[in-house]
């Protein structure tokens, strides 16, 4: 029987894909994904059956991938970053029934952004999406409150969109109840891609007007500091 692979392709760009992800995509007969993400597979999908949709087509893509497997085609459904974090792994497993599914991990945007900023995620951390399309805002607020109170480094995904202009401001206000205004914040747009933009600032100086849905924010904990053009969250090693 054919197999369904749920593949995390990293933040974007062939150089950030794992060898496993590349091998799986090359071996599959069918590829399913969000239309803008298919372009990251240039050189890997020629001659294959490719199915893509736009925004809000996640379940349609999952059902199509399962259908292709049932037709006897080894199929890969792709997610940027890691498919198990805000990706396709969950809905595929919920829908797959008895078909053979393998999850192929990828580099998630928070860790890609962290590598560009320095070493801001060296200790306990929390990843929180500000998108309230699938999660009620009250739940997101509660997550922000608890992560900030616990002094986790916080990686914020989906900080802003045309329909969610105020969520980032609300999130920063919640975090500011537990963090000093001088807490380092890294903002990375298009992490891991050719047009990456990066800014290192502080919690009380974040310009929300410059942040968009392509950004990841990493907000330090009480020990995080800036040295030169890097952010560091020390783990506790005796360096001296």
Please state what every model-predicted region is.
Residues 9-11, 33-36, 53-55, 80-82, ...:
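Fold-independent oxyanion-binding glycine-rich loops
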Residues 38-40, 58-59, 108-112, 133-136, ...:
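Short gly/pro/ser/thr-enriched loop/turn and capping motifs at secondary-structure boundaries
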Residues 1-104, 207:
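Class I S-adenosyl-L-methionine
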Residues 73-78, 121-132, 204-213:
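A polyampholytic, Gly/Pro-enriched intrinsically disordered region
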Residues 10-16, 134-137, 199-201:
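Short gly/ser/thr-rich secondary-structure transition/capping motifs
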Residues 87-150:
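Class I SAM-dependent methyltransferase SAM-binding "motif I" and its flanking Rossmann-like core
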Residues 6, 75, 149-240:
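A contiguous loop/helix-start segment that scaffolds small-molecule binding in enzyme catalytic cores
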């Amino acid at each position: 029987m054919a197999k369904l692979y749920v593949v995390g392709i990293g933040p974007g760009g062939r150089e950030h894909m794992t060898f496993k992800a590349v091998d799986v995509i090359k071996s599959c007969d069918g590829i399913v994904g969000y239309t803008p993400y298919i372009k990251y597979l240039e050189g890997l999908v020629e001659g294959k059956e490719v199915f893509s949709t736009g925004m809000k087509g996640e379940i349609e893509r999952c059902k199509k991938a399962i259908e292709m497997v049932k037709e006897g085609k080894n199929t890969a459904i792709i997610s940027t970053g890691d498919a198990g974090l805000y990706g396709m792994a969950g809905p595929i497993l919920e829908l797959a029934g008895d078909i053979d599914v393998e999850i192929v991990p990828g580099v998630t945007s928070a860790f890609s952004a962290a590598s560009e900023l320095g070493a801001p995620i060296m200790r306990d951390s929390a990843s929180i999406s500000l998108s309230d399309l699938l999660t009620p805002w009250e739940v997101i607020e509660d997550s922000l409150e608890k992560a900030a109170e616990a002094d986790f480094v916080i990686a914020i995904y989906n900080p802003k969109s045309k329909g969610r202009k105020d969520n980032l401001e609300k999130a920063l206000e919640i975090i500011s109840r537990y963090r000093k205004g001088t807490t380092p914040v890294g903002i990375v747009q298009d992490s891991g891609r050719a047009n990456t933009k990066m800014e290192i600032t502080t919690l009380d100086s974040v310009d929300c007007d410059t942040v968009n849905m392509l950004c990841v924010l990493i907000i330090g904990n009480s020990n995080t500091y800036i040295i030169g053009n890097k952010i560091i969250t020390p783990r506790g090693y005796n360096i001296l």
